[in-house]
Amino acid sequence: MRNPNIFLALYVTGSWIWRQRMPMAQCLKSCVCSDYEPLVKDAVQLPVVDEGRVTAAVNVVKLFLPDCLSVDDVLKSRDELKKLAQARNISKILAKSATAIHIARGIKCPKGTENVLRQTLVDNCTVFKSMYSVLAYLYLSPGADTDGMIDQVVAQTADRTIMLGDMTVLSHAMRVDGVDIPHSSQDLAKMGLSAADSDTLDPIQLVGVMEPPSPPPHTADAREDAPHVSPPERRPQSSATLTSLDAKSRRGLAGQVPAS
């Protein structure tokens, strides 16, 4: 005779498997093929093209390229677009040079290094003028061949160009909280502004970069070699002359007083 408990156990187990068939299938699916699930087409949204922005961009390009009437014309004008990109790079260099010159007007540097900075600023002004000329040439000469010209100008002036970052670092090194601070010769040597064995007196005196150079001091030898000029003799004036001068000065002061 068969044991009825076996049939009861099989019935309960089969019922539980039947009730858990969907969760088990999803579990197997997530473990085996989760990386290969197909995308739901309804959830994919294509980017919406803003025609207003496209039209505005075309209108901006038309300011520089009057012959372009559509986006296709702009894409075909690769040479003109290259020229515009070059002009944009030159404009960035011009902006940095102008800002560096403007910042240099208010900063101070250790005495003895102002000549180097002044010469650098002069070279920077030369770069500014050269780049401005090239930029004007690009805008005023449509269809001109500019290959190599800009690279040549940049190569000739790159080693002499002082940029905004250099001026900002220098200005920050010379000032703390808006107050000029003195530097020792060792500090200047660490910043690469002077040699460590230079005969520089401490503390370093700060001078303006844009200030005109002071005239050289007169030495004792120069004063000895200079011809001696005696001061003019002062002749004694009579009392009548002094009285007349005193009266004239009083009348002059009376004429300068505004009438009430």
Curated annotation (Swiss-Prot):
Compositionally biased region (Basic and acidic residues): 220-236
Q: Say which domain of life the source belongs to.
A: Viruses
Composition bias of kind Polar residues appears in 237-246
Region of interest: Disordered: 208-260
Q: List, alphabetically, the InterPro entries matched.
A: Herpes_UL51
Q: Which terms in the GO cellular component ontology are assigned?
A: host cell Golgi apparatus; viral tegument
What are the protein's UniProt keywords?
Host cytoplasm, Host Golgi apparatus, Phosphoprotein, Virion, Virion tegument
- Pfam families in alphabetical order: Herpes_UL51
Q: Quick check: keyword Ribosomal protein in the entry?
A: no
UniProt entry tagged with the keyword Metal-binding: no
| Post-translational modifications reported in the UniProt record | Phosphorylated.
As for subcellular location, the record says: Virion tegument; Host cytoplasm; Host Golgi apparatus
Q: Which family does it belong to?
A: Belongs to the herpesviridae UL51 family.
What the protein does? Plays several roles during the time course of infection, including egress of virus particles from the perinuclear space and secondary envelopment of cytoplasmic capsids that bud into specific trans-Golgi network (TGN)-derived membranes.
What's the subunit arrangement here? Oligomerizes. Interacts with UL7; this interaction mediates UL7 incorporation to virions.
**What is the protein name stated in its UniProt record?**
Tegument protein UL51
Gene that this sequence comes from: UL51
